Amino acid sequence: MEMLPLVKIAPEYNLTLDPSTGMIGAALGREVIILSMDEINEQIAELEATADDLINSLDPTTTPLDSYPGREGVYLTAGKLTNMVYGFILGLIILFALLL
């Protein structure tokens, strides 16, 4: 396997890219310290799952990401209860305004 030259991606920070493996490392003279991106990739995957869950929460028939089984329609039920409470409070305010 042919060794490709390292590509400097940020010379001011001495960061280089190994094009054959896709690893980012710090260049110290002729030596390179290889940094593992596995932990960062795991955090990015977790963030993507959370963002997808936020988008899916706009559909009232979906379930939250870490919920127990059988929780389909929880957003729909929460929306109905919230609207009932708002309607009750608004009705009380109108009733008191008419009585005074």
UniProtKB/Swiss-Prot annotation:
Reaction catalyzed: 5-methyl-5,6,7,8-tetrahydromethanopterin + coenzyme M + 2 Na(+)(in) = 5,6,7,8-tetrahydromethanopterin + methyl-coenzyme M + 2 Na(+)(out)
Functional pathway: One-carbon metabolism; methanogenesis from CO(2); methyl-coenzyme M from 5,10-methylene-5,6,7,8-tetrahydromethanopterin: step 2/2
One MF annotation (Gene Ontology) recorded for this entry: tetrahydromethanopterin S-methyltransferase activity
Gene Ontology BP term (one): one-carbon metabolic process
Key words of the record: Cell membrane, Membrane, Methanogenesis, Methyltransferase, One-carbon metabolism, Transferase, Translocase, Transmembrane, Transmembrane helix
Keyword Cell membrane: yes
Main location: membrane
The protein's enzyme class: translocase
GO CC annotation, single: plasma membrane
Stated role: Part of a complex that catalyzes the formation of methyl-coenzyme M and tetrahydromethanopterin from coenzyme M and methyl-tetrahydromethanopterin. This is an energy-conserving, sodium-ion translocating step.
Family: Belongs to the MtrB family.
Assembly mode: The complex is composed of 8 subunits; MtrA, MtrB, MtrC, MtrD, MtrE, MtrF, MtrG and MtrH.
Protein name: Tetrahydromethanopterin S-methyltransferase subunit B
Protein source organism: Methanothermobacter thermautotrophicus (strain ATCC 29096 / DSM 1053 / JCM 10044 / NBRC 100330 / Delta H) (Methanobacterium thermoautotrophicum)
